[in-house]
Amino acid sequence: MFRWAIIFAVIALIASLLGFGGVAGLSKDFAVILLVVAVILAIVGFISRGRV
């Protein structure tokens, strides 16, 4: 998931440099959502690993 978040962040950067504001904003939003989900899943995985 971190890889996909980085890919969407790069797409947002390239789109913003080329002047595509809508695509850049949408890609940034996807990158942020994926990053938050990945961090939450990583934290849950670290916490639950000791309990299994």
Curated annotation (Swiss-Prot):
Task: Note the coiled coil stretches, chain numbering.
Answer: none
Pfam families recorded for this chain?
A: DUF1328
Grouped into one coarse class, the protein's main location is membrane
Q: Which UniProt keywords apply?
A: Cell membrane, Membrane, Transmembrane, Transmembrane helix
Topology versus the membrane, per the UniProt entry?
Answer: Multi-pass membrane protein
Q: Name one GO cellular component term.
A: plasma membrane
Q: Where in the cell is it found?
A: Cell membrane
**Membrane-crossing segments per the record:** 6-26, 30-50
Superkingdom to which the source organism belongs: Bacteria
InterPro entries cross-referenced by the UniProt entry: DUF1328
What the record says about family reads: Belongs to the UPF0391 family.
Q: What is this protein called?
A: UPF0391 membrane protein ACIAD3602
List the source organism: Acinetobacter baylyi (strain ATCC 33305 / BD413 / ADP1)
